[in-house]
């Protein structure tokens, strides 16, 4: 039934209102869809009806206004696609509508553009590849869109439009854009440069100028807060090449390394290393892997150590290291341990299993001896917030009272260190004919060291201010330290004062734990941290889960003690919980394994060791036998012991309790709250608020 029939039939009879509306809607829809099969009526047009019928005439009408030169060009595309295009992401209306703006545009300019365009397009052929939308503003593009449709298949018209857009560029405009692009270049990564450059007009002059500064002859990775310290020696920076990395020839494996060297002379031969760099601290920050592990290689800590002036230099370096790695500036004091500075913070996989890549990161203060001993203990880790987890494989500095302390700093890294700690072959151990070594030992009084005496007697070496013992301090921040490190002495390295090349006692004994090996004579010693001498960096929220494993043949002392080393100069207090287990059977067998699990619930890392309670400085015999429990006043023998050093609490694990409700807290060290120097359990602490 046709609409007319429908309308005619219903004219005489009154229709219900709903039917009337329905008929109106049907009528409108039928008319529009019949006449406008392309559905272009959806876009608002003045001549909504009858347009399809008039399309040919409409086209001729449209073209009649435009110049003769333009007539042949629009026609072929328009006949093929009357419904519209999407060009460069902009939907363009059908030809009939686009012809209307086109009629006005040439007249708006006052002259038909086609004549000019024909002239221009003749010489516009070469620039055609550069016809890109970058040069147009949005408004200009909207004006051009209709013409782009019609000229899309023609060779010259797009260039014509491009040319018209390019012409307005004055030299000032070009200079302004080039400067803007070069400004962006300075701030963006190299991979983005090409894109940015394309934004400016590609004229060779300015572009080359802007690119020139980016050819980096040396990239110095320095935090803004501490550039001066790191750039102590610009020449050293220049020297920081892979060749210099391989001071021992073994470090050449560190590719992609950016070295930041603090001190001028870097000894290249291993043998001359100790003597030559004696007054000089070379602390190189090596960025070894994309994971941003920084490796502080202190090849000559001895040199650093030998002169007091160097110590001051070391401190800044170590501080910067900490700042760079942990983003913190905790280590301000010049007396920062060389342990810190020389701690080699290398990414976990840096030296893994490669003797050659043995990074020398003896973070030992008196590393000079070990340095001399050429034991490169590489400490690979990412430093926890300025808490240097000093995990040092304590190598037996047998007759050498000064040993090495390596700082192992792990920041949340579950440090899968995979490092092979190896001693350099043939390098005499400190104290064995290395003159630099003895001078260095006393240099840093505040570093703990552990000393193994060749006599085989278990002896406790306290961390005296002279620091003549090597302390292996392992602090991990949430590190459950999977330290896959094989500490090996390379064969033929005579032990300090021992001269026994066959004493490679540090074998990759336990890949998952830092080990301290005492001399084969089985002399075991315990290192005590003297209150006055040791600096504790209290690791902020440092939970160390250390697996303590001793290989049967060699005595190892694992003291992963999170008692972090801090500058004693700092004033703020840190809270250090030490839960210490001493296995009497192993002690008697010459293998004291003291794993100190510490959970530091205070984020303040400044903890002055002077506040250490007397129990901290009791001799080893007393510590193994005990100390006096703060709560029950009985001796602490072989039981687990809990020490809160700044509160003066030293007690049995089972005696440790909440100071308010007396709830046993020995197994709840992670739920301790200290308020006004009183231990609170979680519930009592909540009641305070």
From Swiss-Prot:
Lipoprotein is among the record's keywords: no
UniProt KW Phosphoprotein keyword: yes
Primary location recorded for the protein, binned into one broad class: cytoplasm
Stretches for region Disordered: 1-253, 298-534
Start-end of Basic and acidic residues biased regions: 35-52, 217-232, 310-331
Tissue expression profile of the protein: Expressed in placenta, pancreas and kidney. Also expressed in prostate, testis, ovary and blood.
GO molecular function terms noted in the UniProt entry: zinc ion binding
Source taxon at top rank: Eukaryota
Residues bearing PTM Phosphoserine: 153, 453, 465
Record-given protein name: Zinc finger protein 185
Source species of the chain: Homo sapiens
